[in-house]
């Protein structure tokens, strides 16, 4: 079962708040990417169904980027919302996990939140990593190209790179 990437964003933001850690849009997108990668490697299924794009500063989930772009480089102080088609209001995107998933995501997220956004960008840009191979496939720059789950599965999970 895949989850709404905006709900995962809210999970990360809530986790950061509990630890009094500020997080920018750049850092948030990278953390979600590494959570998705770790989940995919560990459980053999994607965490989210959202398309991951290879932007200049690493993997980006367009839905997350646009939801929080108003914060620029500043700390995000809001949560992701989606339109409720029945009420016409925007409601917070919630998240709920089974015990095993919650334990896994908490452990991964707590580790990732301690890494500065710039270092997360560097980790996402590893040569022969999924971002690098998507971005520079066929020997040319391909901005915004999709980073597929198949590409992610061919790279080492983040923890194995340290």
Indicate where each model-derived feature is located.
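Domain-edge interaction signal
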Residues: 1-162
């Amino acid at each position: 079962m895949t989850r709404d990437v905006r709900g995962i964003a809210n999970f990360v933001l809530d986790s950061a708040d509990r630890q009094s850690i500020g997080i920018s849009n750049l850092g948030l997108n990278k953390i979600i990417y590494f959570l998705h990668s770790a989940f995919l490697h560990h459980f053999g299924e994607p965490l989210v169904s959202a398309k991951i794009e290879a932007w200049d500063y690493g993997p980006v989930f367009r839905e997350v980027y646009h939801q929080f772009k108003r914060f620029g480089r500043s700390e995000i102080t809001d949560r992701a919302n989606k339109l409720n088609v029945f009420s016409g209001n925007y409601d917070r995107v919630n998240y709920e996990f089974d015990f095993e998933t919650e334990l896994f995501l908490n452990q991964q997220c707590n580790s990732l939140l301690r890494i500065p956004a710039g270092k997360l960008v560097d980790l996402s840009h590893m040569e022969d990593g999924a971002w690098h191979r998507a971005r520079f496939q066929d020997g040319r720059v391909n901005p915004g190209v999709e980073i597929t789950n198949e590409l992610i599965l061919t790279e080492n999970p983040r923890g194995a790179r340290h």
